[in-house]
C-alpha cells in the first residue's frame, strides 16, 4: 500500500487509463469514459504497470538453466512491448521537473485536467522522504531546500490545503532547511516566475550573450545543449522580470515557504539572497570568478537600456522558435520546455499559434504509474531501449527462435522510422543530425552519439539475418553511411580529450568554462564532456559497421576506433582498474561498457593488462550471495560505494563485463548467474530494486527496462560460453 492510500488521498480508476503511442513513439496518457474504455482495451503494458488484476501474467514454472531464465524473461518482456515496437516506461527520478509543468500552466492560466491533478498529487506525496516529509533533488535523495520547496509549491498549486498533514510536515522541514530564500538558482527562478520570490534576488542569466560573436569561447552556442536550452529562456524571463499576477493563493504560499522570522514578505531583502544557498543543496559551489561576474552583471541589469533588451529579446525568441521547429514543439527536455512555454505566453500571448502548439505537447513528458503521475526526464527512452532489445536478442541466440521474430521486427521498424532524415533549420546553432538517432523519438530532434551507434548496430544485425530479408531494404545503405558520418563528426579530435565521444556534440569550448557553472546543484553542465560510455558505444557501432561495410572509409573509421580505444584505456583508473560512469551507477556500469568495447577489438583478460585489471576490479566487488551492489553515492564522491543489498541490474552489468572480458574462472560468474536466476520470479519478471541511472553526477534516474534487458543479455552470454547447465 502506498502512503497516499494510507492517508486517504483520492486516486483515479486504474481501469480507465490508456497509453497511446504513434508510429514515431510519442507517448500520451488518457483517462477515458466508461463507454470509451469498452472500445479501447488496455494494453498489457498498462495493465502490468498499474498493477491491474486483469494483467495476463505468464504461467509460473520452475527455471533451472540460464537459457530457460533468459527465455522466460524475454516472454515477459514481450508483454510490455507496444505494437509500434517501443518499450514504454516511467523514466522518472528527478524531483524538480514537475514544478515547470505546474508553473507553465499556472502562469498561462491553463487548467490541469482533474485526473492528472489527482495523480500528480499522489506521486509527489508517495515520493516524500519517509522520515522528515521533504523531497530531494531526486527520488532517493535526502531532503533538500530545492526539492522540498518545489514540491511543496506544486502541491499547493495542485490544490492541497496548507493544513494537510503532508504539507505541515514538509513545511517544518523546509523551515529547518532555511526556507525558500535558500533555494539554488533554478529554484529561485521558478519562484520568481510564480511571484513567490523577487528577480532581484536571482543571479543574472544575461541574454545578451546570444548577441556576442560566435568565435568567443563563452558564446552560449558552445555550451552543453541542455544548459544552453535552459538558459536561453531563463535569460529572457530574468531580464524581463516575468512574473505571474499575484492572487490570493500565491499570497498564502508566500507566508508558508519562508521562515516566520523572515516575514513579512515585503521586508525580505531579496537582493542579499542571490548567493544564499542551503548547504545540503550545494553540490557545486560558486567560483570567485562567477561571483565577480554576477556582481558586475547585477549592476548592469539596473541600467540596461530598453532598446538593447528589445534587440536581445528578438534574438532569444527567434532561437526559441527555431527550437520548436527542430523538435516539433517538444524541446530538448521538460525544464527548457516549461521555461519556453512561459516565454511564449509572455512574448506572443496564450492565444498565439506557437503557444497552442506547445499546449498540444505538454502531456508528452507526463507518465503515469502505480505511485501516480509525474514529469519524466525526457519524453521517453524509446530508441535506447529498442536498440538494446534487438541487439541482445541477437547476442544471446534468442533470434534463432521464431517466436521472438515479431518483437525484433517491430523494434527494428521503429528504429528505421526514428532516424533523422534532415538537418536542423539554419541559424539554430545545431550540428549535422541527418543520419543520427535520438535517445527517445525522432520528433524530439536531438542527436545522441551512443544512441546513434547502438541503433545502427541493431539495424545492421537485422539487415544481415536471413529471417528478416523481407524488411532489409526498409533502410538503405546510404542511411547507415549518414549515421557513420555523424559519429565521425562527434568524435573529439582537436585539443580537448582526443579520441573521446561526448553526448550530443563534440566539445566546442574549454572545460575551464565550468568555472562559470551557475546551477549549484549539478556538475559538468557548462560544456560537452568526454564520456567513457559514449565512447564505448561508438566503438561498438563503428566496429560492427566496419565488419559489414569494409570498403566505406576504412582508414578513417579504423583511425577513429583506434583513438577511441586509446581514450578508453587512458580513462581507466590506474589504481583499481575501474572506469567512472556518468550515465549509470557507476563504476560497474562504465566498466561493463569499457570491457565490451575492448572485447570488440580483440582485447581480453589474457592479452590486455587493462582488461585484466577491469575484470579483477569487478571480481573484488562481488558479494557473498554472488551479486553486486553499488550505491549512487559513488557518483557524487567519485569513489566506489557499496550498496546495501545485491541488485539484479548491477549484477548483470558486472557479469557481462566479466564474460566479454574472458575472465578465466567460471565459478564467480556462475554464482552471479545463479543470483540472477534466483531473483527472477516464476513468471519471468524481475522486480524493481533500486535506481539504475544518473546524470550530472548528482541526480538519479530510473531505467525500468534495464531489469529485463541486461539480465537477459548476461544469461544468454553465459549460456553461449559455458553451455546451458542446470544451475538452480
Curated annotation (Swiss-Prot):
The keyword Zinc does not apply. It is found in: Lipid droplet; Endoplasmic reticulum membrane. PFTB repeats lie at residues 117-159, 561-602, 611-657. Gene3D superfamilies: 1.50.10.20, 6.20.120.20. GO terms for cellular component: endoplasmic reticulum membrane; lipid droplet. It catalyses: (S)-2,3-epoxysqualene = lanosterol. GO terms for biological process: ergosterol biosynthetic process; triterpenoid biosynthetic process. PROSITE patterns: TERPENE_SYNTHASES. Pfam families: SQHop_cyclase_C (PF13243), SQHop_cyclase_N (PF13249). One of its GO terms (molecular function) is lanosterol synthase activity. Induction: Expression is induced in the presence of fluconazole. Expression is up-regulated when ERG6, CYP51/ERG11 or ERG24 are deleted. Its main location: other. InterPro entries: SQ_cyclase_C (IPR032696), SQ_cyclase_N (IPR032697), Squalene_cyclase (IPR018333), Terpene_synthase_CS (IPR002365), Terpenoid_cyclase/PrenylTrfase (IPR008930). It is a peripheral membrane protein. Pathway: Terpene metabolism; lanosterol biosynthesis; lanosterol from farnesyl diphosphate: step 3/3. Its EC number is 5.4.99.7. It comes from the Eukaryota. Keywords: Endoplasmic reticulum, Isomerase, Lipid biosynthesis, Lipid droplet, Lipid metabolism, Membrane, Repeat, Steroid biosynthesis. The active site is at 450 (proton donor). Belongs to the terpene cyclase/mutase family. NCBIfam families: squalene_cyclas. Lanosterol synthase; part of the third module of ergosterol biosynthesis pathway that includes the late steps of the pathway. ERG7 catalyzes the cyclization of (S)-2,3 oxidosqualene to lanosterol, a reaction that forms the sterol core. The third module or late pathway involves the ergosterol synthesis itself through consecutive reactions that mainly occur in the endoplasmic reticulum (ER) membrane. Firstly, the squalene synthase ERG9 catalyzes the condensation of 2 farnesyl pyrophosphate moieties to form squalene, which is the precursor of all steroids. This is Lanosterol synthase. It comes from Candida albicans (strain SC5314 / ATCC MYA-2876).
